[in-house]
Amino acid sequence: MADARTTSVEQRAKDQPRGATGALVFADGRVAWGQGFGAEGAAVGELCFHTAMTGYQEVMTDPSFAKQVVAFTFPHIGNVGTNDDDHEASDPHALGCIVREVVTGASNYRSTSDFADWMGAGGRIGLSGLDTRALTQLVRREGPPTVVIAHMANGEFDLEALRAQAKGWPGLEGMDLAKEVSREQVENWSGGKHVLDLPEGPSTTLGMSGEGDARSQKEPIIPSAVEGPHVVAIDYGAKRNIFRNLVEAGARVTILPATATYDEIVAHAPDGIFLSNGPGDPAATGEYAVPVIRQLLETKLPLFGICLGHQLLALAVGGRTAKMFQGHRGANHPVKRVLDGRVEITSMNHGFAVEREGLPATVRETHVSLFDGSNCGLELTDRPAFSVQYHPEASPGPMDSLYLFEKFVGMMR
């Protein structure tokens, strides 16, 4: 029998190691075995990899990861547990995760749960003991495959059924997921960044929701602006830290569902429009979002888009998007600002990109990936509108690009 601790992605059913309780099943019959943790069951989606060393809780709760299984390239994931503050949404949205080393117990004073227990409570499946380097190389070589991630405590798997499940999944192209992850009701956002009391030493400013235990201060550093510019944000799968940064920049924020109509949006008397990040194929979401965005552009209100919002803005002005071969997901992606050549280290999470070919003359490219030269930002020359493909709010990741929130709020003043 093979060792259950670390297994190859090339193994087949006959190679199941003794004691293996987790399986990653590919449509072509390949199987990677490991130890399951979190929820039991099986889920089908697209395999991707994420290169951040920290921030796994934020990654797992980012709605942009809907219908995806995340393989973390850093070997030690889950060791500090999870807490009640660092969620980017109320629940996990990634289908599951794959880690190299077995998840240990929580070792941070802010932790309220072990990572494995938290995954189980959120109905998400985890696998440990897989060769995550081999998985990453597979995605880079073949593109993101459809997989079924499965955890059975008794080690009994119907591999033919799991393979058929993987083979029958249609993939992310053509899939609108924004409706699935968007909030359904209008929400007035009031939380800014918070002060965290460290055990010994001065307080430190962190991007927290402030919904945790007594060790987190409940009052935001920057209270919700009462007289500041009013941003109406369209939630296609937004991360909470985006709204915290809008508030810190001095804006009042009202959040509307992804399917909000033009009339519903302007009824809130916005000073500016924000288009959020989100999962799925932008062309599919654009079927209902793009006509609304085009109407909003005609108002000449300032408009700012991030990630999916960037792609939707490009579609609204006549551009095209396409699925990337492997996508960009990590917290250390260098991006060049075209205007002055400055390099920003950014956080990214996208599997689709804007094609610069076909963009109209009224669109100026503002940012470019230094990894592959793909488009990472644009602005309109005839409207007060701009967008970026990456995540300036980070969480996790660097804060090189927080100036974009100040730029947006400044355009509304």
Mark where each language-model region is:
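RNA-binding accessory domains that recognize and position tRNA/RNA substrates
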Residues: 2-201, 213-222, 229-259, 263, ...
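Cysteine-nucleophile active-site neighborhood
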Residues: 271-356, 397-411
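Active-site-proximal beta-strand elements of phosphoester/diester hydrolases
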Residues: 230-235, 346-347, 386-390
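Residue-level structural signal for beta-strand termini and adjacent loop
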Residues: 36-37, 75, 349, 380, ...
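Proline-centered loop/turn at the N-terminus of a beta-strand
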Residues: 125, 230, 302-304, 320, ...
